[in-house]
Regions:
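Extracellular/surface-associated beta-sandwich interaction domains
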Residues: 1-244
Length: 244
């Protein structure tokens, strides 16, 4: 229930401050997710999934994500359409539209197509709406509920396909973040409050994550969260490697 989802590169012609770019200057069209705050965490410092009752090691410091490397412009034009994907709305699990497979229900299928597959880009991503709040308490503004947590959606098109036509879309999936040894080192240092001045090298994107998703009131966890959010640069590097 506490997954956080963000999207970058939705508007190639009008990049936002947190958008990223490949070495050749092309915008990265990506989405990534991480372990966010949960209202039931006790103590409420659960970014990175620290082992509160044990040695403090981090059990959920990784970022997972997907990047669009290529999407055909049309069935007859295989040039890369930089404006794809055209839909990046988040999706709440187990609500009436996303639960129950009723492929022959025309009403439900139409709602899936209109509300999820072709809905476009939200004004704010899921993570931008949640901010430093508890991700498990987020409610989808379209339904007013969130029974099963939030996932990131992605949709391409629309394409007009005749019989025999095809579209080529290339995606890269990845996961990255702190190594196992660093998860233990950072978590143990955090729990014992030692060496907390040993902060990671920051980037513009890393600072964006700290500014928007670290609770400034939680000075006790600044060190831990600073290391956890290095995972965002790690997943961007995975996307760049996939492009090569």
């Amino acid at each position: 229930h506490n997954t956080m989802n963000d999207v970058i590169g939705e508007y190639p012609n009008n990049p936002s401050s947190n958008d990223q770019f490949y070495d050749d200057g092309e915008i990265i069209r990506g989405l990534f997710s991480w372990h966010g705050y949960h209202s039931s965490a006790d103590p409420p410092e659960n970014l990175g999934g620290p082992d509160f009752g044990g040695d403090g090691h981090l059990g959920a410091a990784q970022f997972v994500g997907v990047a669009t490397l290529h999407a055909d412009t049309s069935p007859s034009n295989n040039s890369n359409d930089i404006n794809q994907p055209t839909t990046t709305w988040f999706i709440t699990s187990d609500d009436p539209t996303t639960s129950g497979n009723l492929q022959y229900n025309g009403t439900k299928s139409t709602k899936e197509y209109v509300d999820y597959m072709t809905v476009g880009h939200p004004e704010q991503s899921h993570s931008e709406i949640v901010g430093t709040g508890n991700a498990n308490q987020f409610n989808d503004p379209r339904t007013g509920s969130n029974p099963g947590g939030t996932s990131q959606g992605i949709g391409f098109g629309p394409y007009d396909l005749e019989p025999g036509d095809s579209i080529r879309i290339v995606l890269a999936e990845g996961a990255s973040g702190l190594s196992r040894s660093m998860c233990y080192k950072v978590g143990q240092n955090w729990k014992n409050q030692v060496h907390t001045d040993e902060l990671p090298e920051s980037s513009d994107l890393h600072q964006h994550m700290m500014n928007n998703y670290h609770r400034s009131s939680d000075s006790h966890s600044y060190y831990k969260n600073a290391w956890v959010f290095t995972g965002v640069d790690s997943i961007i590097n995975v996307f760049k490697l996939a492009k090569k």
